[in-house]
Amino acid sequence: MLKSKTADFDSKQKLSIALNHAYGMKVSYGLTGYGRQVALDIRFQYIRPERVKDPDYIHEVVHMMDQILHHALFDQKSFEEAKYLLASRLRRQNDDPDSLALKMAFALAAEDHDIAIPIQGALEDIEALSYEEVVALYESWRALPRFVSCCGTLEPVMEAFLNAIPQFEKPSLRMALIPRTSPSFQVLEKNIAQTSIVQVWATSTPIDSSRYYPLLVLNSILGQGPMSLLFEEVREKTSLSYSISSSLVRFDGALLISTGTSADSIARCLRLIQAQIQKCADGQFSDEQLEIAKMDLIDMFRRQQDRPWAMIEQLFLDSMLERSESLAQRVETIRTIERDQVCEVASRLALVSMAIVKEDFDETMEN
């Protein structure tokens, strides 16, 4: 609803025309989970004023930002439209086996943990939502202080506008790692072309721990890097999977392994996945794999210096974690990671949930 209309631009068309008139000014919105908090970020991107031969241009940009941040226009019609679009998106996600398996695995991982709460909501909650609740939430949100950051050169008028926004010194951080529990399993059969498997492994490694950078290296070696064990052993050598990778849910202390395979290959895939984790715990990876994983991470942090949004996101994370590392310090920390540090974090992994959305082969479809 925030992106629909404002007091001065009371239709989607008027708002779109105004953004285009401001030399294609861009606005985007996003929700991101950080442990027990959810951040709503609003991003603005505009051309540097010295490149525009219009003395009023920067004032036009500031006016657009003020309208979007402080004067969003809500009504029952836009509420019903937003509600319909969100519900439709969630239904499409439930029809996608990868998204469905991920949602199921999170729900199984820890029923009372934040990881089990879908950030985009649940269909039953959306259907029960009222217009009055959304308006009340918006008014509460408007009163909250913000975390404001920018990448680029600020003109005095823009700097004055941003400084007038109530801000907090640093974002708060509330997080709890998913507990190590006996694993939970769920299998759902659907009329689909391939099986999707999502496993959630507890890492027992908080993001502000000294073990966090070794965990990043482990994730690269295991399933995220270009020479990952999962890719080489499960997909390339045995052709048991169509896709396989690992990723981290940093603030919840979770490592995900996502696999696309066939129903008759499930058991063999799972055995091989377990074997690769054990390899990491036992240090059975090459020096080359270790160095490539470290260089990939270093390159990722260096590439951030060329990407404004990545720089802002890193600043936000560092502010939350009260971390003041320079790029050089971060690079040096990664370079000095040893094999035994990677083995240690691998040995801490514990499977807590697994969801399988399995193809239900119907012979009548083939005939």
Predicted regions and their residues:
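A broad, low-specificity signal for short, low-complexity segments enriched in glycine/proline
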Residues: 1-7, 105-113, 160-164, 179-182, ...
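His/Glu-based metal-binding/catalytic segments typifying zinc-dependent metallopeptidases
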Residues: 1, 128, 170-229
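Short alpha-helix boundary/capping segments
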Residues: 3, 7, 53, 57, ...
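Active/ligand-binding-proximal structured segments within catalytic/core domains
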Residues: 1-22, 65, 209-222, 230-234
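Charge-rich, well-structured scaffold segments of protease-associated domains
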Residues: 15-172, 237-367
